[in-house]
C-alpha cells in the first residue's frame, strides 16, 4: 500500500508540471499552424476551438472525480490530518490575509 501511495504522489507532481507545459506547447503549436495556414485559416480555427473545448471538459471532469476518490481513501487509511494540512494551508492563509486587509482599511 505504501508503494502505491508513493507512486501516486509522484504522478501528482508530474501531472501538475506536464499540464503547465502542455498548455504552453499548445499555444506555440497553434501559433505555428496559424502562420503556416494562410488562406485556410478560418476553416481550421473553427474546428480547433471545438476540439479544445471538448478535451478541456473531459480533463475537468476527470480531475473532479480523482479528488473525490482521494478524499474518501484518506479517511479510511487514517492519514487525513497530514495531507489535508498540506493541501489546505495555503488557501486558508490567503483568505485570512485578505480579510485582515479589508478590516484595516475600514
UniProtKB/Swiss-Prot annotation:
GO terms for cellular component: chromosome; nucleus. Sperm. The keyword Repeat applies. It is found in: Nucleus; Chromosome. Keywords: Chromosome, DNA-binding, Nucleus, Repeat. It comes from the Eukaryota. This is Protamine.
